[in-house]
Amino acid sequence: MLWFVAVCFAIASVSAMSPADVKKHTVESMKAVPVGRDKAQNGIDFYKFFFTHHKDLRKFFKGAENFGADDVQKSKRFEKQGTALLLAVHVLANVYDNQAVFHGFVRELMNRHEKRGVDPKLWKIFFDDVWVPFLESKGAKLSGDAKAAWKELNKNFNSEAQHQLEKLGLPHA
């Protein structure tokens, strides 16, 4: 029986990814979508992908509920919003090994989204179901470790997001 417990513990400790490893793998995969003065197209491309692959979520973008990829491409709003989103994801990946800063930034993101009526379940799926497929559409070759790192970041992000939503008195999952 003792050997069984030892094996289970060994497997659990091997499968857990350290914050430093999560940071390493997520930051590496972000090379497919850099930020910079001449990189706004990466943020626009995110919203083109998002509006094409997740049409049901356009309802959260007042005035753009019927936008398609061409509309997003021409929109100053989505140029700015895309740059902001891209920067936010870069920050989350780059500070992941500093959990106090990571959690503080997640709370700030929830504060900024407080009045937007975003379904709290969306925070649970964002990185797994939206961000990772977007990265792959941009040519990122994500290893199993990279996908596991994004899954871990997503889990931690969602946990803190739900905590903050509850604190704000908003619906939470």
From Swiss-Prot:
Heme b binds at H113. Residues 1-16 form the signal peptide. It comes from the Eukaryota. It is found in: Secreted, Extracellular space. One of its GO terms (cellular component) is extracellular region. GO terms for molecular function: heme binding; iron ion binding; oxygen binding; oxygen carrier activity. Pfam families: Globin (PF00042). Residues 17-166 form the Globin domain. Keywords: Heme, Iron, Metal-binding, Oxygen transport, Secreted, Signal, Transport. InterPro entries: Globin (IPR000971), Globin-like_sf (IPR009050), Globin/Proto (IPR012292), Globin_nematode (IPR012085), Mb-like_M (IPR044399). Expressed only by adult nematodes in the gut. The globins of the nematode parasite N.brasiliensis have oxygen affinities 100-fold higher than the rodent host's hemoglobins. Two isoforms are found, one located in the cuticle, and the other in the body of the nematode. Belongs to the globin family. This is Globin, cuticular isoform. The lineage of its organism: Eukaryota, Metazoa, Ecdysozoa, Nematoda, Chromadorea. The gene is GLBC.
